[in-house]
Amino acid sequence: MNKQIDDEFLTLITYLLKKGNKKMSFEILIILINVTYTMEGEMLFGKDQKVVENIASFIGNNKNDSTFVGLGLLLIKNMTNKNALVKQILYDYNIIEYFKEIYQKYILNSDIIENVILCLGHFINSRFSKNKYILFSINIIKSQLNHNNNFQRLTAYINILYNLAYTKNCEIIKKMIDEEIYKPLMEIFPFDEDNFSKFYDSTKNNDNNIIIDEETMKKKLQNMRILIIKIFQHLLLLEDNVYIQKLIDSGISQFINKLLKLSDIKIIKNTFNCIYLISFGTFGHVSDLYNNNTVSLALNVSKNVYEALNSKNQIINNNISKKDLLGALREISLAFSILIINSLYERIVPIIEYENGLILLLLKDTLKLIDELPNKRDSISYIFKAFYKILKSFDENIKEFLEKNGFKEVLEKLLNNSDEEVSKCSSTIIDEFFDDGSNDNNNININDIIKDCNFDDNKKNDVDDDDDEDDD
């Protein structure tokens, strides 16, 4: 489309919206919907505020025909998919009042409710996160929790939850936790093969579902799993121990255990990030990870990743890239570093002893690969601090084990690292634990060097959303 055609089309649409009779209404809607299925068409409507308002008025004046309403919602969903201008126009037009009215009027119509939720999801972000949208969205989700055997509804439910969490608004996050609107994801989502089969069978038997073949369903569910984990990551980023305790009381450790039994490398990476975030909490929060066997499961998974990185074990997936493995290694190192830092001595012993010191070797190799890791700067302080605590807390055998396995050589190579903190931390650990005594730096504590030792301030590393896939 060029500008002249755009202008002529918008003029025609304006005329039809004003002059068109009831009989023409469906034809007009179909034309508009078809236009929005192309990127050019989707962006077209943002060029004329009056046209968008006329479309909204046109849709709003025809609420008594469920077919028309369904098409109207589909048009709004398409128009607002990636078009910020249209979102702003409809937002200012107070389109939420239309959503509320339609929701009440067609509460039993599954397809209409699904599209209301999908439309709302497009308005739930940092730019449009006003209370009237948030509260309405939360209330809708609460009222629809028993309908998640409908795949389309479940998709909409997950997307709107993700968009709510992604606002990073503390009050919204607290409301989500208070209302426990995330809980069905922990209970009913098909994470393993058995549950997937049952879930797939239930969707085939549901008349309101669009039939999706099994392979497509598996791919969609895999993408949705990543979104679900990211929802919990954003909830755990809330720096309020009372609310983190509520998540723990609702069974988040058991949920993490489910995730640790899956083999997808992106799930592994994001699951360890959840462990890392919980480990910043109180001793009670950390203890919950031990008491629910989460740490033991995490140790087993870390072994698989470590061996895959060293090409000894293909248990994860023969097609995973080194980049994915390094991303997982970073999150595993962060999680175990914070666990070691924030755990009592007796809790650390099994981690240190696991598989003849595998975690020590994993942390050592993380330092060795530090310049290849994604977001290197986020993790370095915690790994050094963990090693410092280990060397301070345990006997000479630990030092001998590390030295025998090349730890000192790794530190020596890092002495000339371009990151000043890396070289200083390496120097401090060598001087205090591996020097022959000729250097008089033993009174320097690593905390004097690590500028990022206030873990509460550093907790809010943004969730890595690179592997999100749009699954509307």
Q: Model-predicted segments: where are they?
A:
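Positions within the helices of HEAT/ARM-like alpha-solenoid repeats
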Residues: 24, 68, 112, 152-153, ...
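Buried hydrophobic core positions in alpha-solenoid tandem helical repeats
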Residues: 12-14, 54-59, 98-103, 137-142, ...
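Short coil turns that connect the paired helices of HEAT/ARM alpha-solenoid repeats
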Residues: 18-20, 61-65, 81, 105-109, ...
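Alpha-helical solenoid repeat architecture
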Residues: 1, 15, 26-41, 70-84, ...
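Solenoidal tandem-repeat scaffolds enriched in leucines and small polar residues
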Residues: 80-99, 103, 107-141, 150-175, ...
